[in-house]
Amino acid sequence: PKSNLPLKVIVLDDTQRNDDVNNPNSLGFGHGSLDQQRYDWLVQELELGQAEGKLMMIAAHIPIGVEPFPSMMGWHELAPVTEAQLIAKLHEYPNFILWAAGHRHINTVTAFKSPDPNRPELGFWQVETSSLRDFPQQLRVFELVRNSDATVSILATNVDPIVSEGSLAAKSRTNAVA
């Protein structure tokens, strides 16, 4: 890594807490959700990173904008901070470039285009990663590259760990959930 690319990684717990939603019909706590305290903290971190001129990424468990409620993969419809509010807020920071998430255990990339066509720098990317436990048992390496034209590229590389035949790791692949 080179130190001339200032990067702030914000690690965010965006999982539904047992006190986030006062709903006896909740299907558990697998949804995305932010209470006001976590949201305020996130906004403070984004403001600070923007003021410091740092590129910013968020590492969270639950992806955003993927599947509507009641799917267990998306944001809870009764979350104190709605998914739409969160995405709109993220679009306010030109230095915010990446939301990295797991939860669905799939490898996919989604563009969140700027709501203002005259300000494309307000858009960002979401990269979802697979699981080390479940099929396909991969990990992802992220590289941020400053290009010669002053743009930034995000490289997301899937890695298949090499495992010895007959090892516990190799056996686990035969038991991985597909």
Each language-model region and where it sits:
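Active-site-proximal segments of metal-dependent phosphoesterases and phosphodiesterases across multiple
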Residues: 19-39, 47-100
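Conserved active-site segments centered on acidic
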Residues: 103
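Metal-dependent phosphoesterase/phosphodiesterase active-site architecture
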Residues: 1-52, 107-178
